[in-house]
């Protein structure tokens, strides 16, 4: 079986593939089907020979297509149907289980709790594992101050630090988003599936600054749903982030984000676990036991 985290991981007539992988010249419009064919061809050119050489060393037969090999007989989409509905895919059946959530109930650090309690809900910014420039902290602090908001920056893998040490901004390390997000005014992030889903469950507006892959899908979804907006990370400036913050802090978007949280809630991990047991029992030819 194969687990995917966004509908754009599977070829579809409804959704184009995420970048990189669209190899056509931008001046030539292509159908979604042709974009997927180009993507699959590019993937095979990059990886097929290397995979088959390794398989040959192990005495295994060669494969003909990377994606067909990766997508097993059972393909599960670990994403909420309200946030990321799976479109019809004529090539294969996909079971949408809902998001696989491991609750993070670690208490917030005392310093973070004290910061939250000192004023209005702040803006949270985190780019996870993305290799962002250290200079982005200047942009973040300036935009937050322009909108009159306090700021929490997550260090992330880029080890971000504050541009200055004003009392209106703090930096945090690894922290429970489950407990923090319901207490912030908005979440600015790169568009990772986990951060997107957690912010949606928390009912807070989002600003996604996508950099590659399925992050562009998630940025388009939160915009379509009216629970946030997007701004290109490559051209992120104080002005562009200020505009985005002003947009998502509008009462209409705040209300939509709050209401949308009630639509996100299926425990996809439990659904997947039940399906896994059913598949295992069917494969063994018996009903099995608890």
What are these regions (language model features)?
Residues 79-186:
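Donor-nucleotide binding loops and adjacent catalytic segments primarily
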Residues 3-5, 191, 208-212, 230-235:
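Short beta->alpha connector loops at strand-helix junctions that form conserved
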Residues 47-99:
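Long, low-complexity segments enriched in small/aliphatic residues
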Residues 1-33, 82-83:
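Conserved nucleotide-sugar donor-interacting segment of glycosyltransferase catalytic cores
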Residues 172-221:
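A donor-sugar binding/catalytic signature common to diverse glycosyltransferases
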Residues 239-290:
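C-terminal amphipathic helix plus adjacent low-complexity
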């Amino acid at each position: 079986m194969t687990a995917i985290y966004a509908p754009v991981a599977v070829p579809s007539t409804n959704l184009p593939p995420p970048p990189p992988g669209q190899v056509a010249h931008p001046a030539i419009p292509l159908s979604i089907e042709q974009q997927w064919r180009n993507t699959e061809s590019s993937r095979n050119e990059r990886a097929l020979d290397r995979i088959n050489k390794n398989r040959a060393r192990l005495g295994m037969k060669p494969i003909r297509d990377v994606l067909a090999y990766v997508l097993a007989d059972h393909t599960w989409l670990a994403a909420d149907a309200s946030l990321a509905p799976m479109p019809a895919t004529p090539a294969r059946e996909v079971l949408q289980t809902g998001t696989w959530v491991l609750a993070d109930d670690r208490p917030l650090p005392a310093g973070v709790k004290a910061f939250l309690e000192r004023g209005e809900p702040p803006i949270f910014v985190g780019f996870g594992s993305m290799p962002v420039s250290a200079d982005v902290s200047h942009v973040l602090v300036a935009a937050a101050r322009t909108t009159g908001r306090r700021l929490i920056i997550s260090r992330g893998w880029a080890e971000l630090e504050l541009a200055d040490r004003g009392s209106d901004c703090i930096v945090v390390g690894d922290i429970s988003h489950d407990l923090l997000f319901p207490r912030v005014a908005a979440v600015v992030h790169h568009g990772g599936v986990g951060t997107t889903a957690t912010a949606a469950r928390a009912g807070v507006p989002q600003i996604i600054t996508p950099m590659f892959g399925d992050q562009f899908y998630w940025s388009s979804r939160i915009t379509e749903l009216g629970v946030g907006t997007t701004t290109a990370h490559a051209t992120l400036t104080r002005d562009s982030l200020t505009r985005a913050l002003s947009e998502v802090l509008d009462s209409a978007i705040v209300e939509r984000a709050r209401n949308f949280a009630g639509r996100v809630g299926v425990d996809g991990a439990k659904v997947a676990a039940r399906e896994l047991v059913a598949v295992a029992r069917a494969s063994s030819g018996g009903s099995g036991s608890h």
